[in-house]
Amino acid sequence: MTILNHTLGFPRVGLRRELKKAQESYWAGNSTREELLTVGRELRARHWDQQKQAGIDLLPVGDFAWYDHVLTTSLLLGNVPPRHQNKDGSVDIDTLFRIGRGRAPTGEPAAAAEMTKWFNTNYHYMVPEFVKGQQFKLTWTQLLEEVDEALALGHNVKPVLLGPVTYLWLGKVKGEQFDRLSLLNDILPVYQQVLAELAKRGIEWVQIDEPALVLELPQAWLDAYKPAYDALQGQVKLLLTTYFEGVTPNLDTITALPVQGLHVDLVHGKDDVVELHKRLPSDWLLSAGLINGRNVWRADLTEKYAQIKDIVGKRDLWVASSCSLLHSPIDLSVETRLDAEVKSWFAFALQKCHELALLRDALNSGDTAALAEWSAPIQARRHSTRVHNPAVEKRLAAITAQDSQRANVYEVRAEAQRARFKLPAWPTTTIGSFPQTTEIRTLRLDFKKGNLDANNYRTGIAEHIKQAIVEQERLGLDVLVHGEAERNDMVEYFGEHLDGFVFTQNGWVQSYGSRCVKPPIVIGDISRPAPITVEWAKYAQSLTDKPVKGMLTGPVTILCWSFPREDVSRETIAKQIALALRDEVADLEAAGIGIIQIDEPALREGLPLRRSDWDAYLQWGVEAFRINAAVAKDDTQIHTHMCYCEFNDIMDSIAALDADVITIETSRSDMELLESFEEFDYPNEIGPGVYDIHSPNVPSVEWIEALLKKAAKRIPAERLWVNPDCGLKTRGWPETRAALANMVQAAQNLRRG
């Protein structure tokens, strides 16, 4: 029984973000469709070859996506919302981009599809839309074309397909309500057709992803798996693939399915591999997800070997990444600025492939010498002085309940804030960032590369901040922001100014579409050596009589959007960040900043996948936010911002944050999210986002007014704010001015009644 290895997927964007650059060039009309398609082909060929060279036996094909793999699946099934369809019924790459972005080089602009987080990761997918009586047919053959490409290059191919039940689970019903699970029998013939086409190509194994099987699914959804897979069996071998959690709670459902193998995440799940082996059918292959696909730490391969060795030789076995390597940067070897000791603690996607090769070889041969050598640096890290800061640990241990309480309740604070700010009804503001122009990015890059001295850099940033203030005053906004010209990324910026983080040069991972992020890495205890945001906030406030918000990224979001340590709990990391940023709130307040926004867009996405684990997470997540904010005086208004959220199931926790104002992303869901706040009778102020900043389309005054009137039916108008869905960093100035002018006009119209 020779053990093989494989990955569940590989990063798509390219080491130098080649895909991002090609996408954005095409969208801007600066390159042709054929040039874009060529970049995709080159990247796929390179990535297959890199995995093969690193020692991977079975290469994933179908993990590449032009925007998002769930959206690719929608096109495969012919699930194109009517507003995005071509007049002749055809489907092309611009159809895909219109669904994702709201517009493309061809076709009519229309509202983009809703976007939300992929399980509990920092990746986003485009939510499939379902309508009653919907028809499905094989429409988009990207998977088959890519399989042909890989076969022509001589690769050992394992196609990757998002499974039918998970696909339906991830979607939403539009229009007349019905049970979307009722569409299962309608999509299965398309899956059968795809599997038949793969069988014709001589494919032996297909990786069929059903990550919904790690969730606490309703019984009807669990019951749907058996008939679905009865319909899909027989053409190729199916590797039922799960990740992000364990499968033990749903194992009875899984073992009844007519599949030939099961992949389990042995990093994030608590499944005992020996127990799994006992319960799985003896003729099934087990794919053991031993290498963490969503972090950057080098694996202790001696531990991984010990975890799996007891079942070696007892069944067919593959070793694999826990999930797709999509969530990891590509290659550690190009990081030239990392300290050698710290660098030795990491492994990116290609290094993880090498780890899988080492592990496979050791399991096949019984020789573990190479594993011990590989694991030595990560074992040595446990004793490094760069990891532990006694002062931070002491401060954390001394936290009391009082540290997470504002001095007075919201009603008392609101009165003090009204007296201080004297804002009009329907106050207007933005979420924080303004367009990051080429000039701004060049300025930061020149400074970072040493081509610009500190004085000239500061002068340049000050000019951009001044421009942002002038623009906002001209537009008539009520509460201003400084625009964040100095910030490359809302998490990276804070990480750069906090001890305990390190940064990469090329550690990019895809967030959605062409958007990539370069997460900081938490390597040790976190503290704040000096104020971070105070200087620029104070400068911006000196330029205007209107209030300027101080802008902080909250502790849970910094945690969720960084690569965390694996040797302490997430709670510990979050509270260390909260204590550091608590000092920042106090310093902003002392500098005369009266409104401070602590962004927590990631609060909900950090939820464990199983509801039974939610309470513990929400308890410490809320406490971290309150530790961060509670130092503020009554007349300092604390805002928070959240996006991509469904709130109804965590409203108690949202209210427990005790922010004076919460701004939320609601435009894509047509104010749906406000139902939760209405039903809960949310007591504080709310700014429901009135337009979608992810789309370049400019909303009309009438559209915004209609949304605000809809909001006012749910929330008393005196507690409503008017703002976009999110920061404006990715937009250009022309559409930003136009959209904000319409937003301000809508608010003014409502004030006049």
Curated annotation (Swiss-Prot):
InterPro entries reported in the protein's UniProt record: Cbl-indep_Met_Synth_N, Cobalamin-indep_Met_synthase, Met_Synth_C/arc, UROD/MetE-like_sf
Keyword Glycosyltransferase: no
Residue ranges that the Swiss-Prot or TrEMBL entry lists as coiled coil: none
Binding site for 5-methyltetrahydropteroyltri-L-glutamate: R17, E18, L19, K20, K117, R515, C516, W561, E605
One Gene Ontology biological process: methylation
Active site: H694
Pfam hit, one: Meth_synt_1
Record note on cofactor: Binds 1 zinc ion per subunit.
Keyword Nucleotidyltransferase among record annotations: no
Source superkingdom: Bacteria
Residues engaged in binding Zn(2+): H641, C643, E665, C726
Enzyme Commission code(s) on record: 2.1.1.14
Residues that coordinate or bind L-homocysteine: I431, G432, S433, E484, D599
The reaction(s) this protein catalyses: 5-methyltetrahydropteroyltri-L-glutamate + L-homocysteine = tetrahydropteroyltri-L-glutamate + L-methionine
Alphabetical list of CDD domains matching this protein: CIMS_C_terminal_like, CIMS_N_terminal_like
MF terms in GO: 5-methyltetrahydropteroyltriglutamate-homocysteine S-methyltransferase activity; zinc ion binding
Signal peptide: none
PANTHER family: 5-METHYLTETRAHYDROPTEROYLTRIGLUTAMATE--HOMOCYSTEINE METHYLTRANSFERASE
Job of this protein: Catalyzes the transfer of a methyl group from 5-methyltetrahydrofolate to homocysteine resulting in methionine formation.
Annotated family: Belongs to the vitamin-B12 independent methionine synthase family.
Classification via HAMAP family: Meth_synth
Protein name per Swiss-Prot or TrEMBL: 5-methyltetrahydropteroyltriglutamate--homocysteine methyltransferase
Organism name: Escherichia coli O8 (strain IAI1)
Classification of source organism: Bacteria, Pseudomonadati, Pseudomonadota, Gammaproteobacteria, Enterobacterales
